[in-house]
Amino acid sequence: MAVKLRLTRMGNKKRAFYRIVAVNSETRRDGRPLEYIGFYNPMVDPAEVKIDAEKVQKWLALGAEPTDTVRNLIKKQQA
């Protein structure tokens, strides 16, 4: 089972925000996640990002692969 760290879309039409989740790579975009890691709200200025660093490190140690967007959000959070 390959695990990915990726975004799932939440919110209303034209008012999206995203949860950052660990999910099986074969699961659909808004499918049931293995674990919630944080959230990303691009609708506010500046964009709001909250990521649980301990959970990210746990999943990366287990071999999870973040998507490009999630990788960039993690880097921003750490800086």
Swiss-Prot record:
Protein name per UniProt: Small ribosomal subunit protein bS16
Organism expressing this protein natively: Nitratidesulfovibrio vulgaris (strain ATCC 29579 / DSM 644 / CCUG 34227 / NCIMB 8303 / VKM B-1760 / Hildenborough)
UniProt keyword terms in alphabetical order: Ribonucleoprotein, Ribosomal protein
Family membership: Belongs to the bacterial ribosomal protein bS16 family.
The keyword Ribonucleoprotein is annotated on this UniProt entry: yes
InterPro entries in alphabetical order: Ribosomal_bS16, Ribosomal_bS16_dom_sf
Database matches in Gene3D superfamilies: 3.30.1320.10
An annotated GO BP: translation
Keyword Isomerase part of the UniProt annotation: no
Source taxon at top rank: Bacteria
